[in-house]
């Protein structure tokens, strides 16, 4: 079982400068390596305060120079918003400067707000994503490639800086689509999934969807890696827990607004947080998620691992305006106590 950090780089208000958010995110990635996490993932979003990282590859390249062993991943490159031939060149370059530590997460995107500002029809995102992934695979595997598709025409093209990892860096697809999951299994890619703030029942349903997708390609679930994105927090301090839950719910509210075009902003940038009918109470979130005392978090993680059987759990660390020093202590706590305890319990169960 691997553990990763997922770093969103959110800004909850102007009391946080954008520079401080980015610096805090980088600091969390560096500490993630020191604490023993296998991977640090960076999101991609645009034009608002939900997330301040416009290019996760830039974050990977920067953090590669500040770390030495941790894997560094894009979670995710939103393919319909890219020229794939340029993205290919950047992927090769970043894997080289990261000494072969790049984990390449890709997805189709979901925020209408972003697509409108790039002039891309979000209804066509799945088809554009599929074609872009075709192009990435050609460019990564072939010395010279061409492409003729519905959305793009590319003459014979060579990428000058090739990835160190052959034939490609590990590719992770973020999706809730069974069709896209099936493609991942067919082509040997990994999956990045989430149950949002739901509990074991949703994780069980998710396991069934993945199993069906794998089976449709004659595969077993274990034939590809599965990473679960999860909000987790361990503490005996009720105020800390409430602050983490509050920031997690803040992020979810903004995500839903950006997806459903309900976003409101007085200045065109900082989105107003609005309650929604999908909001969960703090008590429900505590019940559903690995949140609470150290023992409660360990026990809950083991339950969730038993249901979903993921290969990796990526915990959300940079949410809203949660206190940076407190989160750094939390990352250290995972390295000191939670990860070793979970690994020990899993080792006993497998023996």
UniProtKB/Swiss-Prot annotation:
Keyword vocabulary terms for this entry: Monooxygenase, Oxidoreductase, Plasmid
UniProt keyword annotation of Oxidoreductase present: yes
Tagged with keyword Oxidoreductase: yes
Gene3D superfamilies: Luciferase-like domain
Classification via SUPFAM superfamilies: Bacterial luciferase-like (SSF51679)
InterPro entries hit by this protein: Bact_Lucif_Oxidored, Luciferase-like_dom, Luciferase-like_sf
GO molecular function: monooxygenase activity; oxidoreductase activity, acting on paired donors, with incorporation or reduction of molecular oxygen
CC annotations in GO: cytosol
Pfam entry (one): Bac_luciferase
Entry's family note: Belongs to the bacterial luciferase oxidoreductase family.
Protein name: Uncharacterized protein y4vJ
Organism (species): Sinorhizobium fredii (strain NBRC 101917 / NGR234)
């Amino acid at each position: 079982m691997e553990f990763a950090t997922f770093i969103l780089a959110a800004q909850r208000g102007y009391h946080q400068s954008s520079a401080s958010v980015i610096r805090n995110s980088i600091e969390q990635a560096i500490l993630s390596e020191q604490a023993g996490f296998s991977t640090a993932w960076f999101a991609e979003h645009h034009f608002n305060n939900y997330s301040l990282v416009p290019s996760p590859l830039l974050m990977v390249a920067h953090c590669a120079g500040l770390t030495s062993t941790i894997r560094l991943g894009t979670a995710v490159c939103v393919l319909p918003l890219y020229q794939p031939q340029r993205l290919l060149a950047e992927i090769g370059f970043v894997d080289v400067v990261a000494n072969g530590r790049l984990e390449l997460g890709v997805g189709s995107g979901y925020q209408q707000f972003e697509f409108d500002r790039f002039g891309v029809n979000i209804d066509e995102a799945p088809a554009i994503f599929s074609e872009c992934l075709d192009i990435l695979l050609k460019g990564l595997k072939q010395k010279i490639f061409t492409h003729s598709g519905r959305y793009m025409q590319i003459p014979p093209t060579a990428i000058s800086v090739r990835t160190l990892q052959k034939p490609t860096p590990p590719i992770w697809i973020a999706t809730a689509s069974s069709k896209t999951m099936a493609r991942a299994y067919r082509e040997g890619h990994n999956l990045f999934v989430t149950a949002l703030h739901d509990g074991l029942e949703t994780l069980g349903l998710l396991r069934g969807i993945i199993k069906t997708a794998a089976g449709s390609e004659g595969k077993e679930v274990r034939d590809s890696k599965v990473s679960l994105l999860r909000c987790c927090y361990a503490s005996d301090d009720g105020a800390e827990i409430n602050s983490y839950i509050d920031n997690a719910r803040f992020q979810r509210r903004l995500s839903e607004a950006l997806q459903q075009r309900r976003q409101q902003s007085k200045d065109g940038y900082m989105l107003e947080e609005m309650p929604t009918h999908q909001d969960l109470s703090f008590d429900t979130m505590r019940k559903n998620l690995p949140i609470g005392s150290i023992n409660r978090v360990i026990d809950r993680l083991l339950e969730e691992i038993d249901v979903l059987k993921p290969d990796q759990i990526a915990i959300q660390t940079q949410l809203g305006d949660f206190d940076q020093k407190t989160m750094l202590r939390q990352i250290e706590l995972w390295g000191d106590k939670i990860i070793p305890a979970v690994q020990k319990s899993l080792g006993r169960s497998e023996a």
